[in-house]
Amino acid sequence: MSSPDGGYGSDDQNQGKCSVPIMMSGLGQCQWSEPMTSLGEGKLKSDANSRSKAEGRIRRPMNAFMVWAKDERKRLAQQNPDLHNAELSKMLGKSWKALSLAEKRPFVEEAERLRVQHMQDHPNYKYRPRRRKQVKRMKRAENGFMHMTEAQESAVMGTDGRMCLENFNLGFHEQTYPQLPQASHYREPQAMAPHYDGYSLPTPESSPLDLAEADPVFFTSPAQDECQMMPYSYNSSYTHQHNSGASMLVRQMPQTEQIGEGSPVEGMMACQSSPHMYYGQMYLPGSTRHHQHPQAGQPSPPPEAQQLGRADQTQQADMMAEDRTEFEQYLSYVSKSDLGMNYHGQESVGPTADNGPISSVLSDATTAVYYCNYPSA
């Protein structure tokens, strides 16, 4: 019958201990568990091997300082039990240096006797120093690399026990790749600025809807190349009307005006393709006299158009300065207004459906001839 205290402090406890091996005998011993006897035997074997190596290794004979410090170290250790062995060695070295030669003589003689005795006992002895310093350095390096302080562990581990990979400073730097140039080079006029430095072109003003616009904006090189290019997105009938009007104006002008370089009519008619190519399909026949005022959704005009306007202004000033007839000046003024370019405060009046550019040129020419032949008072 078992005791009420559950077997603690009674004989039933021993019976319970004995019954456990009997109950577990059928299961057998686990394969991964090692018996306690093997661990104890391993420790005993390692101690025996270390002792045999120490006994088999021949020690070097003591010098005079070692003979003197053998007894002196014991005496200092008894006087200062709290001092570390390194501190005792420092004190022994200072006191040994402080001794005179007469005081060191008996210890030197004793060290010589021990050396002779050692040579007699071990004639084939050769000093083989133990590389303990290198081993200690390696152990210190391994300990410093493997073991971390609690502060470092808390820095590496998060507050909830998870690993924070950002805290590892492994020496890897993020590699930055250069950004690829944008495919739409026409969207960046600053990158193309060095290409146009030789032409001394003005910088076009940017529009707020340049980025949102899907159609590309073409920035071609000089105006001469642009004059040779053919427009692609305007009405063919409108082109025919302008060409016919230009031919009529050229026929009416004298030969000296046609042969001279930089004729205003030929230059403007030849370079009229630049507004067409710039504005594309948005350039309509009805808006010929108003294209110099673009809407909010249109991009800023190209630099070639601004340069063309400045060249025409200077050319008109030269024409006004020269002594020409009123008939020639009036024809050049009419041709510019019909082409949709306003100069010096000219009012832009849209053409009507009845009067085309040819009829307006003919009517204005007849009026000019009439007033030119009229005798002045």
From Swiss-Prot:
Lineage: superkingdom? Eukaryota
9aaTAD (motif): residue ranges: 325-333
Basic and acidic residues bias (residue ranges): 42-57
The cross-references to InterPro entries, in alphabetical order and at most eight, read: HMG_box_dom, HMG_box_dom_sf, Sox7/17/18_central, Sox_C, SRY-related_HMG-box_TF-like
Q: Which UniProt keywords apply?
A: Activator, Developmental protein, DNA-binding, Gastrulation, Nucleus, Transcription, Transcription regulation, Wnt signaling pathway
Function description:
Transcription activator. Binds to the DNA sequence 5'-AACAAT-3'. All of the sox17 proteins are required for embryonic endoderm development and gastrulation movements, and show some redundancy in function. In addition, the sox17 proteins have distinct but overlapping roles in later gut development. Acts downstream of vegt-signaling in endoderm differentiation to induce a range of endodermal genes both directly (including endodermin and dhh/chh) and indirectly. Also represses wnt-responsive genes to inhibit wnt/beta-catenin signaling.
Comment block on domains = The 9aaTAD motif is a transactivation domain present in a large number of yeast and animal transcription factors.
Q: What is this protein called?
A: Transcription factor Sox-17-alpha-B
The taxonomy runs: Eukaryota, Metazoa, Chordata, Craniata, Vertebrata
The gene for this chain is sox17a-b
